[in-house]
Amino acid sequence: AGMGMNFGMTLGAMAGQIGLIFAADWQVWGIPGLILAAIISIPISVLLGIMIGKLLNRAKGREMITSYMIAFAMDGVYQFFVLFMMGPVIPIIHNTLKLPRGYGIRNTVSLLNMRQSLDNLLAVSVGGVKIPVLTLIIIAAACLFILWFRRTKLGQDMRAVGQDMEVARDAGINVERTRVISMVISTVFAGFGMIIYLQNVGNFPTYTAHTQIGMFSIAALLVGGASVE
């Protein structure tokens, strides 16, 4: 939608991590834990996506650097909530997640009981190599969703806005609303992606896991042939 690469996807990653923290605290593991984490991350991602979308509407032409700075700023907000609010304000049941002082989340959250839940659910072994069928199905479904979405009115509106905002506005498209929706969708999917990524690893550093994910994701997009538009 003419907003360039979304460095603000880091905010979605933070939402995904918060979902996983609550899933671990409530001892909901495996696929149910992933679903719970995703459900928790959705409203957080939507709110963050609306916020960043409205901010970027005020920074037209400078979206990428603005989203990068927003990600840095929101990192401080995330750390404040996780380090100081979880425990005294936001209830955390299990002390194994808390810092020794009694509040704040430990530096590493273990997801051992959730590790590779997607990969193992429909795994097929071929020549001693485990093929994560369900993970591949999810990736294929995401690709099909993108192909379908590009043919919808909203998808066409986003393409039009990305090509020329003024022409899109003259055509009756609500440019600002379309840009906000694109950021919401991007942030929600970033949260899902972070959840899938971290369940594969089996643990995550609470305060740094999200910091580089935006760079890695955008590098993957560029290597895959995406343009900055």
Regions found by a protein language model. Give the residues of each.
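Single transmembrane alpha-helix segments in multi-pass membrane proteins
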Residues: A1-W26, V46-G61, L221-E229
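Alpha-helical transmembrane segments within multi-pass membrane transporters and channels
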Residues: V28-D75
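Transmembrane helix-bundle core of multi-pass membrane transporters
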Residues: M74-R151, P205-T206
